[in-house]
């Protein structure tokens, strides 16, 4: 195998064995999948609201503004928007049900916590992507 050996220069050896670039790239792919799962969960939940003939009141701005959590507010708005033209929800607007199932009413809080975790992870990954990982640092 008459291969010529290469001469590794400063920083190149570490670049071959250092995993920060791979880990950051893998984190980006995982973040994208996580985002997709969260959006799908919100969409599926809006279908569940229709399937249980529930009200959109728990997803109103007035209720979501009672708590200061970004993720919860966004989930409420997303589900409320998804159901804004729902004929099923509109047909049960005046029903005599006292309350919808708790599992429906707490969707914004549960999904919102996951969205807040996503935003934290997104910030961390963006910080890593924009950070120096060279060793040694040459100025």
Segments and roles (model prediction):
Residues 16, 49-139:
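Accessory "access/gating" subregions that flank catalytic or transport cores
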